[in-house]
Structure formats: C-alpha cells, structure tokens
Amino acid sequence: MSRDIFMKRLRLHLLFDEVAMVTHIVGDVLSSVLLCAVVLLVLVGNTLVVAAVATSRKLRTVTNVFIVNLACADLLLGVLVLPFSAVNEIKDVWIFGHVWCQVWLAVDVWLCTASILNLCCISLDRYLAITRPIRYPGLMSAKRAKTLVAGVWLFSFVICCPPLIGWNDGGDGIMDYNGTTATPIPVTTTQTPVTGRDDVLCDNGFNYSTNSNMNTTCTYSGDSSLSTTCELTNSRGYRIYAALGSFFIPMLVMVFFYLQIYRAAVKTISAYAKGELKTKYSVRENGSKTNSVTLRIHRGGRGPSTGSSVYRHGSTYGGSAAGAATREGCGDKDAAGGRRFGRQEMDSHLPVRKCRSSDASLVTLTGLKCEIIDNGNAKHGPISELIKGRGKSFFWRKEKKRSVGGERESFENSTRNGRSTRAKLCGGRCLAIETDICSSGECSPRTKRIKEHARATQHNSLPVTPSLSSQNEETDAVFVRGTSNSEYKPRRSRLSAHKPGHAMRLHMQKFNREKKAAKTLAIIVGAFIMCWMPFFTIYLVGAFCENCISPIVFSVAFWLGYCNSAMNPCVYALFSRDFRFAFRKLLTCSCKAWSKNRSFRPQTSDVPAIQLHCATQDDAKSSSDIGPTASGGNGGYT
C-alpha cells in the first residue's frame, strides 16, 4: 500500500516536472526570439545609419557627426555586449569565464554611457542651431564637434574605470564597472523539499536526482571552472556616482536644451504671426492714383517683436526715391541717425547702409521719413513730399548672409520712362538707385547700350534667400513695395516674384522643417528617458535595499535600456527624409549608383530662393527675369 502511494507521488512529481520543463522551454524560446530581435535591430539599424552617412555627402553635416558617433557606440554595444548579455539572460548563468566577465561589464557601461552622452551632444547641437543661428557655424564647427566626440568617450571611460582600480564593495570576486562580482557557483547543492512533495526544480544548467529519502540533489552539468554569475555589487557610493554621471545629469541637460528649443519655436511662430500684416488700398492725390507701400518684417532675433508696429506706421506712404548714378562705397551707419541699429529699433526706422555717390542725388528710406542728399544738400521730410515727380524706384534691404562662398553682390537694371535704375547689394544690404541717363533726348553710346540691355532683360527683381536656417543665415529682412504711376509692365519670368504671401510661406516652410527636427529630438529624448529611467531607478534603489527588486523586474529594466540603442535608428528612418531615402537606397542595393548621381549640396541648400519684385498694385501680376549675375542654381548670388 505504501509502495503504491510512493509510485503515485513519483508519477505526479514527474508530471509536474514535465509541465514545468515545457513552460521553461517555451519561456526560453520566447525570450531568445525577443532578445535576438533586439540584438539584430541594434546591429542592422546602426549599421544602416553609419553606411548612409558614409555613402551620402549630403548627410555629412556637423549634426550628423554626433549621430554617427551615437550609431557607432550602439553598434559596438550590439557586437561586444548584447550577444553575451542575451546568452547570460537565457541560460541564467555566466559561462564565458572570469576575465571576460570583467571586460564585458566594463565595456557595457562604457558604451551605454557614450550612447547617452551622444544624445546629450545632439541636444546641445540643436539648441545652438535653433537659438543662435547666426553664430552657430562658429560655435559648432567640425573641429569642435570632433572635440566633443572625443570628450564623450573620455568622460564615459571616467565613469566606467573606478571599479577597475579598486572602488568596489570589498568582495572577493571580480569587480565590474558597477562593482559587480563574479562568484563561482558550487558544483553540487542539496535542497530539502517541502514535506510531502518532491517537485523541487534545479536552476538552469543543473541536473537533479532524487534519492529514496526524497532529497533532491542539483548537479551542474557543465564545466565547473566556467560556472560564474556576474552580480551587481552593493557599493552605494559608486552606484550613486555612476547613476548621476551616466543618466541623471545628462537627462537634465537634454531636458533643459529641449525646453529652450521649444521656447524658441513658440517665440518665432509668435513673431511671424505679428509680422504677417498686409495693407492693400490706394488713394487719389492730385487726380493721379498712388499706391500704398506694403511692408513685411520678419524677425529672428531676441527681444519682443516690433515688426507689426513698423508696418502699421510705415505703410501709409507712397514710396519712391531718386538716387545717384555712381556708387563709390558703403558706410556702416544708418541713414537717419548716423548710428548702428538693433533689431528692436525697427519700429522707429528702417536702417540701411548709406551708399555714397559722386554726383546726382541719393535717397535713403527710413520708416516714416526720408532723407535726400542732392549734390551735398540734405532734405528731410515725408517720402510723399520728397519724391513727388521723381517717378518710380524701390528699396529693399537684406541682412548679411553667411555662406560657403562668402558675401555676394547682385545688380539689376530697369528702365522707367527714360530713366535707368541700378541696384546693388551694399555690404549685405541693398539700396535702389535711380538716375537720369539721357539729357535733352540725347543718349551717349554707353547709355544706349545700357538702355538696350535694360529693355532686353527688363529686370525688376533681386533674388534673396532669407530663411530661418539654423545654420548659416540671419532672419531679419524688410521688403518694401514702391509706387508708380507709369504704365511699365515687364514680362513674367518663372524665376521672378510671386504673390505677396509667397515669401512668408517659404519662411514658414523652412521653419516647419526646423520644428520637425525639434519634434524628432523630442521623440529621441522621450524614448531615452522611457528606456533608461526604470533601470537607473532600480539601480539606485538597489544601493539602499538589496532585496527590494525581483530578478524579473531587474531583467526587464536592464533590457529596456538596451532597447534604446535599437530605437534611435528607427526614429531617424521615420522622421528624417534624407535618412529614409538613404536607407531605402541601401536596402535596394543601389547605393553606388545613387552616390554618383547625387551632387553635393550644403545644408542650407534646402532654403528656397525668394525673388522679390517691386511693382505697383497695377503691376501685381507683372515681374521680370533674373539678371545675368544672379545665380539660379543655389538660390544665392554670384
């Protein structure tokens, strides 16, 4: 009878063992598939990022220096750390020896910290690009970017090296970067089961045997010399040091930079909303039709926007100005007060660089008032009084533009009722000049050639490239439409001016690209916090409470941090058109042909050229060709 009971218990015990074994196998298979998928995503995704930048010159920007460095850190993590972590997680025992345990853990923290600090550098780069667009090329040059990259790797090593030189919890085992100990596992252990049950299971990698006394003996089935486990040490000081240096301080830095980027975005949108004011009407003066000036101000600097007040006060006069025939030089002072101006002073006047001339007269347009210097005699007063009977001219200014080619100049000529207009960029800003070219109906041969050239080209616009670029260019620009009572209607060119709101739309399109980059940065930072916050929180809690965290929770948080290295390339592919295009080309094996067909364009090539024309409302549908000196290839000036 007792023997039958013993056999029933034995069969029940074997059934429980089989169920537990099947469950354990299924769990191992699912864990293996999931962990292998993470490892493959890290390897493939970051390899694509590095290959995309290597094969596309368009992607070789300063920002992408940090992105490539981030991808390299994650790629090395996928090669040197993750495969061993996956095996250790699945087998639940370290089988690669004591020495590699130490190296593996040190490399793990080094690469993880480098990945986190690279995200911090990307946030810094975007912060400078968006909040300081003019100074950005000087602040974040290629040399400084490489210096930051070197600093990332050096600081990461400083975080991982203290345990290697003795900062640990005093244990006898091998210390890793976090002070983990590699402890040998006993070859055999004896466990006493619960009374009446003999379903004790051994750890993974051990075999069990049950004797007649119902005691279970677990015996390691592998090489006893390799049976080690790498466990985190309880060195409280180092855990705090590593958690702050590897995660919490970089996280605060990234959050600060992103908040500043968000504030800059909101501020710029508000400035554009205030600057997009339009006045369209006409008045009768002495029986002739006079059109009002339409002025837009786009502000990109600090301080409150004053563009709208400038517009309201300066949009009621009809703007026409006569000027000098010969330009000899440019000054650095504004026309009204003889002093430099700030962006916040636009509500009082519209500054330009005064162009000195050797003869005739010079006109400088400054807000409500105009100054005419006629053969050395200066006259001040409203524009409508000073320009009566002088015909049509126009004025516009553009802040200095930094570009690869440096400062450029552009000229234009046009003919209005026997008068020639010639405009030239003056130190980055432009003043339109109008002069008489014929006297008593007689024109010199040179003058005739000028007139013929003017009629042939009929220039009435100057190309400019104002933008919100975070890389190279200033964002202040003022556009003024002049007035005329002439019947001049130049022919339209496909490169000429567009409708009044076109410039604003182009500005906003460029700014939308900047907002998209900021949104991508927000997603990257959010993914970073979501992935690493659980692990480092548990890591700190473990320093004060050893048994508060279950092994399963620790493993999930541990691998969630690794998932961040797999998510970064996915974010680039989803939100970056250039990276998405490069990935598609690489995956379709057409990288070589694509690289040959793609010509190099600097990062500012995305900025569209804006052609502005100067015409009355009667001529709203008219515009002219771009002059022979204007470059249509890059949206700039020759």
UniProtKB/Swiss-Prot annotation:
<feature type="topological domain" description="Extracellular">
    <location>
        <begin position="168"/>
        <end position="239"/>
    </location>
</feature>
<feature type="glycosylation site" description="N-linked (GlcNAc...) asparagine">
    <location>
        <position position="215"/>
    </location>
</feature>
<feature type="transmembrane region" description="Helical; Name=1">
    <location>
        <begin position="29"/>
        <end position="53"/>
    </location>
</feature>
<keyword id="KW-0472">Membrane</keyword>
<feature type="transmembrane region" description="Helical; Name=3">
    <location>
        <begin position="103"/>
        <end position="124"/>
    </location>
</feature>
<feature type="topological domain" description="Cytoplasmic">
    <location>
        <begin position="576"/>
        <end position="638"/>
    </location>
</feature>
<protein>
    <recommendedName>
        <fullName>Octopamine receptor 1</fullName>
    </recommendedName>
</protein>
<feature type="topological domain" description="Extracellular">
    <location>
        <begin position="1"/>
        <end position="28"/>
    </location>
</feature>
<dbReference type="GO" id="GO:0016907">
    <property type="term" value="F:G protein-coupled acetylcholine receptor activity"/>
</dbReference>
<feature type="transmembrane region" description="Helical; Name=4">
    <location>
        <begin position="148"/>
        <end position="167"/>
    </location>
</feature>
<dbReference type="InterPro" id="IPR000276">
    <property type="entry name" value="GPCR_Rhodpsn"/>
</dbReference>
<keyword id="KW-1133">Transmembrane helix</keyword>
<keyword id="KW-0297">G-protein coupled receptor</keyword>
<comment type="similarity">
    <text>Belongs to the G-protein coupled receptor 1 family.</text>
</comment>
<feature type="topological domain" description="Extracellular">
    <location>
        <begin position="88"/>
        <end position="102"/>
    </location>
</feature>
<feature type="topological domain" description="Cytoplasmic">
    <location>
        <begin position="54"/>
        <end position="64"/>
    </location>
</feature>
<feature type="transmembrane region" description="Helical; Name=6">
    <location>
        <begin position="521"/>
        <end position="545"/>
    </location>
</feature>
<keyword id="KW-0325">Glycoprotein</keyword>
<comment type="function">
    <text>G-protein coupled receptor for octopamine (OA), which is a neurotransmitter, neurohormone, and neuromodulator in invertebrates. Activation of this receptor by octopamine induces an increase in both inositol phosphates and cyclic AMP. The coupling to adenylyl cyclase seems to be less efficient than the coupling to phospholipase C. The rank order of potency for agonists is p-synephrine &gt;= clonidine &gt; p-octopamine = xylometazoline = phenylephrine = oxymetazoline &gt; B-HT920 &gt; serotonin = p-tyramine &gt; epinephrine &gt; norepinephrine &gt; methoxamine = dopamine = histamine.</text>
</comment>
<feature type="topological domain" description="Extracellular">
    <location>
        <begin position="546"/>
        <end position="551"/>
    </location>
</feature>
<dbReference type="GO" id="GO:0005886">
    <property type="term" value="C:plasma membrane"/>
</dbReference>
<keyword id="KW-0807">Transducer</keyword>
<keyword id="KW-1015">Disulfide bond</keyword>
<feature type="region of interest" description="Disordered">
    <location>
        <begin position="618"/>
        <end position="638"/>
    </location>
</feature>
<dbReference type="InterPro" id="IPR000995">
    <property type="entry name" value="Musac_Ach_rcpt"/>
</dbReference>
<feature type="glycosylation site" description="N-linked (GlcNAc...) asparagine">
    <location>
        <position position="178"/>
    </location>
</feature>
<feature type="topological domain" description="Cytoplasmic">
    <location>
        <begin position="125"/>
        <end position="147"/>
    </location>
</feature>
<feature type="transmembrane region" description="Helical; Name=2">
    <location>
        <begin position="65"/>
        <end position="87"/>
    </location>
</feature>
<dbReference type="Pfam" id="PF00001">
    <property type="entry name" value="7tm_1"/>
</dbReference>
<dbReference type="GO" id="GO:0045202">
    <property type="term" value="C:synapse"/>
</dbReference>
<keyword id="KW-0675">Receptor</keyword>
<feature type="transmembrane region" description="Helical; Name=7">
    <location>
        <begin position="552"/>
        <end position="575"/>
    </location>
</feature>
<dbReference type="InterPro" id="IPR017452">
    <property type="entry name" value="GPCR_Rhodpsn_7TM"/>
</dbReference>
<feature type="transmembrane region" description="Helical; Name=5">
    <location>
        <begin position="240"/>
        <end position="259"/>
    </location>
</feature>
<keyword id="KW-1003">Cell membrane</keyword>
<feature type="disulfide bond">
    <location>
        <begin position="101"/>
        <end position="230"/>
    </location>
</feature>
<feature type="topological domain" description="Cytoplasmic">
    <location>
        <begin position="260"/>
        <end position="520"/>
    </location>
</feature>
<keyword id="KW-0812">Transmembrane</keyword>
<feature type="glycosylation site" description="N-linked (GlcNAc...) asparagine">
    <location>
        <position position="207"/>
    </location>
</feature>
